[in-house]
Amino acid sequence: MEENIAALEGGVSCRAVATGMAAITLVMHLFKPGDHIIAGDDIYGGTYRLFADVFTKWGITFSFVKMGDVETVRSAITPETKAIWIETPSNPLLNLVDIKAVTKIASEAGSEIITIADNTFCSPYLQRPIEYGVDIVLHSTTKYLNGHSDVVGGCVVSRTEELAERVAYNSNALGLGCSPFDAWLVLRGIKTLGPRMEAHQRGAMALAQMLDAHPNVEHVYYPGLESHPDHELAKRQQDGFGGMLSFDVKEGRAAAEKVMLNSKLFLLAESLGGVESLIEYPESMSHASMTMEARRAAGITEKTVRVSVGIENPEDLVADMKQALDS
């Protein structure tokens, strides 16, 4: 499995670990007290929690910035900066980061700054950050790489042998390894990654177009829509627009909760990337560990609903979401 994922991402080595959060934890052990890391203000809530509530206690500092603005990223660099953490598209608002521009900024600022990309939302089928100069790519293999919602796992892919050796040493020292059976299941899932991703994004595009035209929807976050501010970047940087989307319901929390409870094909669950469609509420689920102030600064509101589009018939998904919005 490790060889397979390393080849898919174009890295020299992959290290499989027990969970996606274990992959992030493993990467974070490359740093020491006093180091500074730049990350997006709209990243996954679990990542934000680990950074803000755990690693800050170790003396590592973080700047959470608008990663879509490369000048903002550049201005956040300090003499202590050792890494730039990229999550693109971001979770849950599907904001994109210009990977090539950020890696260029990092290289210009000094050889000590490494770039790290969480590629879970796209999978290597749609995006390969190492091609744009990223040093480390990580995944929650629980999601698209496995694709069947029956595994918990993660992995770290390194661009250089030097980084690969450090990652492997830390993984062994920390005891973060993935079980052989889970690795076998992920490898099974990877065999259908291509057809699954094509089905995911067909359904996501159909759903996004319906939501974009629905009177009860205020805004749709999906890079496949031409109205998305990063649509052109997505066309350049990705090989497709993916199966994740979010939208804001006009009438606020009560209406958003009603949509989630009234949908019949979308299971209420926080995970993503499986063959079944899921719906969740970032305000109290995936991003509940962020402070309200941090959520609002990132653009996450009580109106926001996140959807992981499965591989079901797009017409069925559209019809079900429409009846949930209309009810």
Segments the model singles out, each with a brief description of its role:
Residues 1, 27, 166-167, 255-259, ...:
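Hydrophobic side chains in well-ordered alpha-helices
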Residues 1-2, 99, 164, 183, ...:
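A general structural signal for well-ordered alpha-helical segments in protein cores
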Residues 1-15:
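Active-site-flanking structural segment that lines cofactor/substrate pockets
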Residues 5, 87, 200, 259, ...:
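Residue-level signature of catalytic and energy-coupling elements of molecular machines
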Residues 8, 211-215, 263:
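Acidic-histidine catalytic/liganding microenvironments
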Residues 13-216, 221:
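Conserved PLP-enzyme active-site core in the AAT-like
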Residues 52-53, 61, 79-82, 109, ...:
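PLP-dependent enzyme catalytic core of the Aspartate aminotransferase-like
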Residues 217-305, 309:
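Conserved C-terminal alpha-helix-loop-beta "cap" of PLP-dependent enzymes
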